[in-house]
Amino acid sequence: MAQHFLQVEGLAKRFPDPRGQEGLTVFENVNFTIDKGEFACIIGHSGCGKTTILNVLAGLDEATGGGVIMDGREIAGPSLDRGVVFQGHALLPWFSTLKNVEFGVRSRWPGWKARQVTAHSTRYLEMVGLGQALHKKPAELSGGMKQRVGIARAFAIQPKMLLLDEPFGALDALTRGTIQDELLAIVEATHQTVFMITHDVDEAILLADKILLMSNGPFAKIAEIVEITIPRGRTRATIHHDPQYYRIRNHLVDFLVNRSQDYAGGGAEGHDPRHPPVVRPGLAGGATLVALPKPVDHSNPPASPAVLSHASH
């Protein structure tokens, strides 16, 4: 069985009650994988633990159960192998745009000469349309420009995985769309592996290869994994003309409005969070559900994954 680039198995986060009571289990038994070069979005209602999961992937927080393996190694603490972009830009206010990016590049490659650091940093700022704003301080930039700097800084260290926590949530619609296009172009050019939190189903359909649907908390878990079967080369201007678009969108909205409640607390009947179903609602004729393969048991040969087809033939 092929090894996945990122493997999340049995992840749980519990917060103890200082009064000695049972405490709060935000999520438990969270399982999913991401392949190298894949763009995965996670969607769910507030309070289900999406940002906590991202922080665990970043090494900024510790899970109370389960584990995360990236590129064959368990994640334990922050690393330059993972670039993070938060909703807030988190720029150093006393540094220029260029120096903010150079700061990360120097940390990644401490042996580089100054000219090499500057050229590398400038290239990534130009990729997000900031070639004319290299020497401006953050206070001189708009919200969209600040977020572009954060994206350039994350890409410039060439991480094995990029983690995005609602990076466009505070931006106006026009700026948001422009940066989405820039992000798509860079991801496709660099084959970057991405894990992104969003509340915007349209954004997820545009950007992602697959979408992880999270049930409501507490005791949240991955309910479904939706594969986006619309071919790559998507654009904001044309994606809604694809016949798959509204089938996928309606499926996502129905989950968020109706079906996510079925998983509250203990979970929906018959749902196994260790093997959340893979759903392809964009395909004509109905969804195809594929049970994810179980983790490899090295003492026995792996069984073939079951395939349940809900499509009409």
Task: State where each predicted segment sits.
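Conserved ABC transporter NBD signature motif
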Residues: G66-P78
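Short helical segment in ABC ATPase nucleotide-binding domains corresponding to the A-loop/adjacent helical element
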Residues: L98-R106, T118
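Conserved ABC ATPase "signature" region
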Residues: A114-A133, A185
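The feature captures the beta-strand-to-loop junction immediately N-terminal to the Walker
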Residues: I43-H45
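A short, proline-enriched helix->beta-strand linker immediately N-terminal to the Walker B motif
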Residues: A156-K160
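Helix-to-loop junction immediately C-terminal to a conserved catalytic motif
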Residues: A58
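Conserved ABC ATPase signature
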Residues: K137-L141, M145
